[in-house]
Amino acid sequence: LKTITHPYDFVVIGGGLSGLCAAVTAARQGIRTALVQDRPVLGGNASTEIRVPPVGATQCNFGFSRETGLIEELFLNNLLRNPTCSPEGWNLELESLARNEPNLELFLNCAVCKVAMNDAGDRVTGITAYCSMEETWHEFVAPYLADCSGDGVVGSLAGAPFRMGVEARSEFNEPMCPDEPAPDTMGMSLHMHARDAGRPVPFTRPPWVDLELGPDDFGPYRPVCEHFFPDTGGFWWLEWGGALDTVHETRKIKDEVQRITLAVWDYLKNRSPLAERLTTYELDWMGAVPGKRESRRFEGDHVLTMNEIDEQAHFEDAVAFGGWGFDHHPPGGFHDKLNPSTHQYLRGPHNVPLRSLYSRRISNLFFAGRNISATHYALSSTRVMLTCAQLGEAVGMAASHAVKSQLDPRALTEGSAVRSVQSDLLLADHHIHALEMPVIGDLAPRAKVTASSVFSESTAAESWGIDRLSDDRLLQIPVASERLDTLSLRVDADRDTELTYRFHQGPTNGSTFPEDQLAEGRIRISKGSDQWIELPLQVDIPRPGWHFL
């Protein structure tokens, strides 16, 4: 077979959002970069093959913590050029992001099979990937590599130490862990999509799908009928395989999840309360590649823990942030009648240190994505794709500094070296939670902002919906001024009544938990609709940021 050797400064393995962001970031810093992907498309779990919606910090109430930098650029371009958000249009945006970079070469359909090591066995000198489309071996030689492949194929072949399964509670004192370690991971999912064909379309369950489901098979936690129409991501619980080896038994897991998915469609189509409504619907797409949540987690100089995420721990070498809660899935998936996800929300956004993004043993190997140095329960937060994209961007920037300075990843975690990485990340519109530092060349601190229009009472919409105050409510608002005298609310009252209120400041860590109370009071409200009432707060604001009513 034909063999081609490619010399690069930096090679990224894995074309999901983490690998794509790592490769593009490094290339934009002038680094000759290769992106090696074993699938025909980019995007990983967000690709047209799997179609999991990317989520991140803003889905958990951190309203001004949307992931910025490269992933924001990608999303804005997708909205501009793919306004209907079609899967194929999204695929084109992903590939265009890579192909538009002159310093980046994309190698699709190339599966890594071998790694070459130095004599000491602590450094990867090259990798070999096979492209079946052209019956060619591609050898990549580079001083630095990033394994963003999810399963960590390069790290595994190189002998980098890793973890799988759940740690014992005693190892890191994580409260959700069992007393003893367990091999269980979170399972894999297949998504499906149906369309209205405009005429009756029958569906017959294939004979090999020997699973006939009824309403009792879904239990109280899987509202299959409620999910079908409003939410394209509603079938994330079509999941299984966490009790198996999520690397070496992927084919077996995929077959069973496909069987479950077809059985669910058979129930929806033929026997569910939606059956009559779905008479004209046909299954027009089903994933052929399972979306993975968890497999290997490679050990770095620091293992990120659940407690550090929950406590918003400070790291001098912080390079990326996350905000998704602890989202743990039972290993039995669909066949386990427990709640398919135990989701514990966070106090606020948290950071990830650079020391968790490289191997502690292989000196030139970075990691980004779901294979980073984290515990099982920490990964249940960091594994979501917008967080992974942030990790990839951080690794790409760190790799560019490593190439230019000829330093290994470990040497970038302290002093001026890590501050330089952080500064360049901030200049690229990347976000690191609660990090404030001067950035050379940053024009934003001196910029002036003007507005073409101002929102006022007269321009308010007639209604944004009604939030009834029969129970307590918490309103989260940003306050930038040094004093707040009044706060106006628009209310409807079906009788004369009284409103009790308290006003709290927020914490300094970006959390959405109220802290010290600044004001309280009661105000009479007369019967009537569409009234603006003023709460006389009369308070000094100790610090700008989140406040709560």
Please state what every model-predicted region is:
Residues 7, 25, 31-32, 37-118, ...:
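Conserved N-terminal/central alpha/beta ligand/cofactor-binding core
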Residues 15, 38, 370:
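Cofactor-binding loop segments of dinucleotide-utilizing enzymes, especially the Rossmann-like FAD-
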Residues 45, 113, 121, 126, ...:
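Flavin (FAD/FMN)-binding glycine-rich loop and adjacent Rossmann-like elements that form
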Residues 547-549:
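Long, compositionally biased intrinsically disordered regions
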Residues 488-492:
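Short edge beta-strand/loop segments characteristic of extracellular beta-sandwich folds
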Residues 3-16:
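Beta1/beta-strand and adjacent pyrophosphate-binding region of the FAD-binding site
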Residues 19:
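N-terminal Rossmann-fold NAD(P) dinucleotide-binding loop
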